[in-house]
Regions:
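Mature, function-bearing regions of proteins
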Residues: 1-149, 153-319
Length: 319
């Protein structure tokens, strides 16, 4: 693979098209770039040297990781029932994905005041989401136990997608990523969240028997294969990205929810996804919230794309 630390240069016309598509994907309602550009100088919940800023800059990794996270979330009966009963995911999946993606990026890159305001609005909404799950248990979206699972699976998905398809991460980076996420998790209402890779694995071990095979999961995967998230010429790749997401889920959890290995990537497909992930990690786009956050803090556009001491510490072995 190419050195991921070297900025990718593509023809200007193509660069503009990619920027425009990313802007539409992240801001479907036409909201302004000032979400991340202003107020000038205001810090985010996390600093630009964080592992989170490194990982969240990659839109392909976020897409793959987001699918993996939602699969695990929907397999928990209370979370799955809440999402399917109280959101517009089935009717307007792309709009739902766009809002969720924007919220995740605001949490990481947005100015602290706006991020906290957005999170407060989300928590108020969660208070109103109550019902009976498919397994007969009552649920509320503000339940700290459910928020912990949603937060942990989101962190897991984004981290593992980046590690598998973009750039391998050292153990210290993985632990840092989980510990960095703690302040935002508390704001969302999660009282106890994994702060290390070991803690995440322990949570997964406890949850393994509580996840269920669900038609909701399979409906979600069918939607993700069809939703027009990519430009029309690239939409056939969504099947591969969905497979890539399933593949990062631990085998024990995957088997327990009925996904098995039938949806695994072929070796050539894995190489293709890795090449795409590498390219996305080296393409500096002015519409990327990561770049806009750097501008807000008076940092160069390519700050997150410059070499770091540990970038080449772990060679990839699956390509």
């Amino acid at each position: 693979m190419n050195d991921p630390r070297i900025e990718l240069r593509i023809p200007r016309w193509l660069h503009h098209k990619v920027e425009a598509h990313l802007a539409h994907l992240l801001r479907p309602d036409g909201s302004a770039d000032e979400d991340f550009l202003e107020p000038r100088g205001e810090p985010a919940l996390l600093g630009p040297d964080s592992v989170s800023w490194k990982i969240f800059k990659n839109p392909l990794g976020l897409y793959i990781g987001g699918i993996a996270a939602v699969v695990l979330q929907l397999a928990e009966p209370r979370v799955g029932s809440g999402v399917w009963q109280y959101t517009t995911f089935r009717q307007r999946p792309l709009e739902r994905l766009q809002r969720t993606g924007h919220a995740a990026l605001m949490t990481v890159y947005g100015p602290r005041s706006r991020a906290e305001q957005m999170i407060a609005a989300v928590t108020r909404l969660h208070e109103r989401v109550r019902g009976i799950a498919s397994d007969g248990r009552a649920f509320c979206a503000s339940d700290p136990e459910l928020l912990e699972w949603v937060h942990a699976t989101a962190c897991f998905g984004f981290l593992e997608a980046y590690h598998a398809y973009v750039q391998p991460l050292a153990a210290l980076e993985r632990d840092r990523f989980y510990s960095e996420s703690r302040p935002a998790a508390v704001l969302y209402g999660a009282r106890s969240t994994p702060e290390s890779q070991a803690a995440l694995e322990a949570l997964f071990a406890r949850m393994c028997g509580q996840l269920q095979r669900s038609d909701i999961v399979f409906d979600f995967l069918r939607i993700m294969r069809r939703v027009p998230a990519l430009p029309v010429p690239l939409q056939p790749l969504q099947v591969l990205l969905t497979k890539a997401a399933i593949e990062v889920i631990p085998a024990a959890l995957r088997d327990g929810i009925g996904l098995g290995t039938a949806r695994s990537l072929a070796p050539w497909q894995r190489r293709l996804v890795c090449h795409a992930g590498d390219a996305a990690d080296r393409l500096v786009l002015s519409t990327n919230p990561a770049v806009q956050a750097c501008r807000r803090l008076h940092l160069p556009d390519d700050f997150l794309y410059a070499p770091r001491p540990n970038d080449s510490a772990m060679p990839r072995t699956n390509q």
